[in-house]
A protein has these predicted regions:
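Short, flexible/disordered intra-domain loops and linkers
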Residues: 60-73, 135-145, 181-183
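Conserved acidic residues
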Residues: 6, 123, 130
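Single conserved hydrophobic/aromatic residue that forms the stacking wall/gate
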Residues: 1-12
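C-terminal interaction surface of TIR/SEFIR-family domains
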Residues: 23-24, 49-50, 57-63, 172-236
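Alpha-helix termini
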Residues: 89-91, 155-164
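Conserved N-terminal substructure of TIR/SEFIR domains
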Residues: 15-124, 221, 225-236
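Short beta-alpha junction loops
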Residues: 131-132, 162-179
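Conserved TIR/SEFIR loop-to-helix hotspot centered on a Trp-containing motif
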Residues: 132-158
Length: 236
């Protein structure tokens, strides 16, 4: 039985005729799973999230990532580290593009359609903040990250299913000297800054996040739940 995005889905998985206990599995709209039966209170289980990552691929003013950076470190190395962690050491699912997935030969419209497909099938967007993520001489509407954030926090309906707004977490990466001081004076994209200020997007340093991903992922979902919809800035 399939489950549409944004739906609540419950399924009976076990029934014991001798004890009259019926066990159910329950997913909510954020893909959080619960197990419960009719004799005890339901119990929450940590389940994998579908995660999209928004970042500036070629920003090279970042600290090297062990095992993933060569002589020319770049932000993509952090994405590869997270992709490896999610796939091999957690229950989370990485929904972004792989490093060997070259879309440069395609039109921007085609690339945007592919990105929207990935974001539609996700429930959390992680934005990697790096020193040069924002190009100073280009309009914000001409850069990918604001569009990815805007799409992530919209409710989007396709056919019979509606994808709810993603939770969003901003992770500040260390610069090439291993410092985070640049973030204090950095001019962020307007849509990102506004949704940090209104409480929708928690911010964490890479050093804290990499050792306790689930803690900060949960914080993003809490912020999503606790921030009134009217406070969100959705447009770029």
């Amino acid at each position: 039985m399939s489950r549409g995005l944004g739906d609540v889905y419950k399924r009976q998985i076990q029934s014991n005729m001798f004890t009259n206990i019926i066990t159910y599995v329950w997913w909510d709209s954020n893909s959080t799973c619960y197990l419960y039966h009719n004799k005890i209170k339901r119990r929450r289980i940590t389940m994998g999230r579908k995660i999209f990552i928004s970042y500036k691929y070629w920003d090279d003013d970042v600290y090297p990532v062990p095992r993933f950076s060569d002589y020319h470190p770049k932000v993509r190395d952090y994405v590869s580290w997270l992709e490896d962690k999610f796939q091999n050491r957690t229950e989370h699912y990485y929904k972004g593009e792989s490093d060997n997935e070259d879309l440069s030969m395609y039109s921007e419209n085609y690339i945007w359609d592919k990105l929207k497909d990935k974001m539609y099938d996700s429930s959390l967007t992680i934005i990697l903040i790096s020193p040069n993520m924002k190009e100073p001489n280009k309009w914000e509407k001409s850069q990918w990250i604001p569009w990815e954030l805007s799409y992530s926090i919209r409710k989007t309906t396709r056919a019979y299913y509606t994808s709810q707004r993603n939770a969003v977490l901003a992770v500040v990466l260390p610069d090439k000297h291993g410092n985070y001081n640049y973030y204090k004076s950095m001019r962020l994209f307007s849509i990102l800054q506004a949704n940090i200020v209104n409480g929708y997007i928690p911010v964490v340093s890479w050093n804290d996040f990499k050792y306790n991903c689930d803690k900060y992922i949960d914080k993003a979902y809490e912020a999503q739940k606790n921030t009134p919809e009217y406070k969100l800035q959705i447009n770029i």
